[in-house]
């Protein structure tokens, strides 16, 4: 998750409880329902709790400005090379599986060939005489 997305989530986490707290306080302080202190207390607590995401959002903002959350070009290249090497190893493993499957399939389908035919199939192209 990028620092900008985290900062946005923290800011939304700050605004939602604060707005809910204000609504609860206004609803609790209504003339008809002034006796309902539970809503008032819940509203005040909700406003106080909204301070934690505000602090987190401020921290992320300052970290983004001073470069704490950004990765260095060396780290980015190193991570990219590691990913390429991992992909290469995975591809080599898959190729080995395919070769093994082909060898199994070919050796299983050509048992009727004699030793001379097998030698002919195994000879390199440059060693065969051509007129």
From Swiss-Prot:
UniProt keyword list: Coiled coil, Cytolysis, Host cell inner membrane, Host cell lysis by virus, Host cell membrane, Host membrane, Membrane, Transmembrane, Transmembrane helix, Viral release from host cell
GO CC aspect terms: host cell plasma membrane; membrane
Alphabetized InterPro entries for the sequence: Myco_phage_holin
Gene Ontology molecular function: any one: pore-forming activity
UniProt main location, coarse: host cell
Membrane topology: Multi-pass membrane protein
Cellular location(s): Host cell inner membrane
Pfam families per record: Phage_holin_7_1
Transmembrane feature ranges: 9-29, 40-60
Coiled coil spans: 74-104
Task performed by this protein: Accumulates harmlessly in the cytoplasmic membrane until it reaches a critical concentration that triggers the formation of micron-scale pores (holes) causing host cell membrane disruption and endolysin escape into the periplasmic space. Determines the precise timing of host cell lysis. Participates with the endolysin protein in the sequential events which lead to the programmed host cell lysis releasing the mature viral particles from the host cell.
Domain topic, free-text comment: The first transmembrane region undergoes a helix to beta-hairpin conformational change, which is responsible for its self-association and pore formation in the host membrane. The coiled coil region is required for host cell lysis and for cytotoxic activity. The C-terminus determines the size of the hole.
HAMAP family from the UniProt entry: HOLIN_D29 (MF_04168)
Family, per entry: Belongs to the Mycobacterium phage D29 holin family.
Subunit structure, interactors included: Homomultimer. Self-associates to form a pore.
Protein name: Holin
């Amino acid at each position: 998750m990028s620092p900008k997305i985290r900062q946005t989530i923290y800011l939304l986490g700050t605004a939602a409880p604060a707005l809910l707290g204000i609504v609860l306080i206004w609803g609790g302080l209504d003339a008809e329902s002034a006796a309902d202190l539970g809503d008032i207390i819940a509203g005040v607590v909700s406003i106080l709790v909204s301070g934690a995401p505000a602090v987190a959002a401020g921290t992320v903002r300052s970290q983004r400005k001073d470069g704490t959350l950004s990765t260095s070009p060396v780290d980015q290249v190193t991570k990219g090379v590691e990913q390429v090497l991992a992909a290469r190893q995975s591809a080599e493993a898959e190729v080995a599986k395919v070769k093994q499957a082909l060898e199994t399939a070919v050796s299983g389908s050509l048992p009727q060939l004699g030793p001379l035919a097998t030698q002919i199939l195994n000879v390199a192209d440059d060693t065969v005489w051509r007129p």
